[in-house]
């Protein structure tokens, strides 16, 4: 989703995929081939890469920076294997729902920076409030309770095994 990307050649990537496939020892290990060609070379070259990567043995294709439903659909129509969609905020792709992606034929969706952005925004807001007010009383409502934290990390269970 960044500008000014440089691509390795299709042939070089195909070779990398073939090497990865040959080295694969666990049938549950997936070779996921990413292509950033759309933002550099356009959709037609992306389709060429998708087909070449599948032919090289990739288990899944990760077409990066599809702009809209139409581009996601074009890739699906030209791909034979599983597809991964990247829904990162502030990127080049229109943010689609899980249901939309399923309807478009995508198998996996990732939200690679969503939780980090949520957490850091809350941290920033909280620290600004503490700096301004001189205390954290006004941000406690935004915090996870101790009880919930302990539930999430199964704190009580960990004490049993000590």
Residue ranges and their predicted role:
Residues 5-6, 138, 147:
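Flexible, active-site-adjacent loop/turn segments at secondary-structure boundaries
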Residues 76-135:
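Catalytic-face loop-and-helix region of soluble metabolic enzyme cores
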């Amino acid at each position: 989703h960044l500008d000014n990307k440089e691509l390795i050649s299709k042939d070089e990537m195909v070779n990398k995929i073939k090497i990865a496939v040959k080295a694969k020892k666990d049938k549950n290990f997936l070779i996921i081939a990413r292509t950033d060609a759309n933002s550099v070379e356009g959709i037609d070259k992306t389709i060429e890469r998708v087909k070449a990567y599948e032919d090289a043995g990739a288990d899944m294709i990760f077409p990066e920076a599809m702009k809209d439903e139409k581009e996601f659909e074009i890739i699906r129509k030209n791909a034979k294997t599983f597809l991964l969609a990247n829904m990162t905020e502030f990127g080049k792709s229109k943010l689609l729902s899980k249901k939309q992606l399923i309807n478009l034929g995508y198998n996996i969706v990732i939200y690679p920076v969503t939780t980090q952005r949520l957490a850091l925004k809350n941290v920033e807001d909280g620290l600004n409030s503490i700096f301004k007010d001189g205390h954290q009383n006004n941000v406690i409502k935004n915090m996870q309770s101790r009880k919930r934290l302990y539930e999430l990390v199964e704190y009580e269970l960990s004490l049993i095994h000590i």
